């Protein structure tokens, strides 16, 4: 049990360090983007981590999915979900956290669509999109 707590605290400290704009383990910068950043063009360096945090409604079937990502320019390296507050309500709000790593220099569109997987992206009810300009 104590090992689990120590590992959890260690992981939480690592996530906090990434979110603060510091260097990640590999020495890459981390940038955090939220829904209000949609429509922006962001400048990043090859190797940088782009963290996208989007809220969803748990229990509705809707979720955020990356669509059309240019795998030569950026890759999804991790995905996690958490309750946006200390109150863990069944079917309540959920925050998704995705970490993408910038790869080859150039521009690529990072788009996340909010839809029910059985309905497909063409039935998306919301969208988040940023243009990554990788140097």
Task: Describe the residue ranges of each PLM region.
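Aromatic sugar-binding surface patches on proteins
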Residues: 90-97
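Glycine-centered tight-turn and secondary-structure capping sites
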Residues: 100-108
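Short, solvent-exposed loop/linker segments at beta-strand-coil boundaries, enriched for Pro/Gly
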Residues: 60-61, 68-86
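Bacterial N-terminal signal peptides
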Residues: 2-13
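Boundary at the C-terminal end of the N-terminal hydrophobic targeting segment
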Residues: 15-19
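Short acidic/polar inter-strand loop motif in beta-rich domains
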Residues: 115-122
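Interdomain boundary/hinge segments at the C-termini of tandem beta-sandwich modules
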Residues: 132-134
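N-terminal edge beta-strand
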Residues: 23-52, 57
